[in-house]
Amino acid sequence: MKVCVASPYPLTELKGNTVTTSRIVNILRGQGIEARGSYHFDGREADVLISLHAVKGVEGVRDFREKMPKGRVIVLLTGTDLYQSLPQGSEAGLQNLVDANRIVVVQEAAIRRLPVEVREKVVVIPASLDPISIEASPLASPFAISVVGHPRPVKRPFLTIETVARHPEWQDVEVWQIGEGLDEESRKTGEEWSQKEPRYRWFGGLPREESLKLCAKSSLTINSSILEGGANAVLEAMSMGVPVLASRIEGNEGILGEKYPGYFGEGELDGMLQAIIDKRVELRDWVDLARARLPLFSPESEAACWLELLTDLDYRQGQL
């Protein structure tokens, strides 16, 4: 079986979708499947196309069906699909789901976001994380809060420093922003904070290993997204033992669990940080709860799910 995993972004760009593409390709190859990654569909022979992004993958899927009429299509939904493009009524994206042989989501809650008529085709495959050898080693001082991810409006990347800036009494707190400003507005905002707030440090885009090591030195990492399919940065922090404070959205709950205590709602970040700084919260408990969920996101578990899905598709194709 030949499988093409198509990303909506060039594979040279360090984005969540490209990381996902590379991970799936490696998983499939580990199962003996001839898999490759590409920027959209590359036109080469394939039995199955795994297309990331229902909306941005429309043209690639169309091209695949024209060139490989007997091929099967799996659409892997992203957070942008589920919480932005599809709810806003993307007809092309919805039709892509109707036409797909299978639809993959990374968490159960996502199924409720989809039209009833396509739900029977949905398979839940939690995204995995390769083992990370780096362990949390927070600095004694300052109390560093890491914010990891390329700044985009849906991630509310500057919410943490905006909150800290309202509290001059938090003298020992620093905010470490890790991620490349991909647009002029984000770069400008980051530079402005760097100039006016001495407790803010923007490291820009870093190689993954450097980003992980820096996050490991922080006392806390914050994910403040408005919408998120499931952040790699949250899984990475969990694996390293860095406490996670996260916005209460489906994407974060799908990773950390509904009963995880480290969530904040609208207007609650000040209070949560104050409780942490005052040591009224035991962050060690958060770490233990998060790490207990890591087996759900093991490479072995994800590999088994993908193999089962592809085997089922291959079997059904053989019955036609």
What do the PLM-derived regions correspond to, one by one?
Residues E258-E268, A275-V281:
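Conserved acidic donor-binding segment of nucleotide-sugar-dependent glycosyltransferases
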Residues A136-R166, V175-I178:
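Conserved donor-binding/catalytic core segment of Leloir-type glycosyltransferases
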Residues K188-E209:
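Nucleotide-activated donor-binding/catalytic signature segment of Leloir-type glycosyltransferases, i.e.
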Residues I226:
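Aromatic "clamp/platform" in nucleotide-sugar-dependent glycosyltransferases that forms part
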Residues V98-V122, P126-I132:
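A short, active-site helix/loop in glycosyltransferases that binds the activated sugar's phosphate group
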Residues G16, V281-Y315:
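A charged, aromatic-enriched C-terminal amphipathic alpha-helix characteristic of glycosyltransferases
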Residues L97, G205-L206, K213-S218:
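Short alpha-helical donor nucleotide-sugar binding micro-motif in glycosyltransferases
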Residues P243-A246:
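Short hydrophobic beta-strand element within catalytic cores of glycosyltransferases
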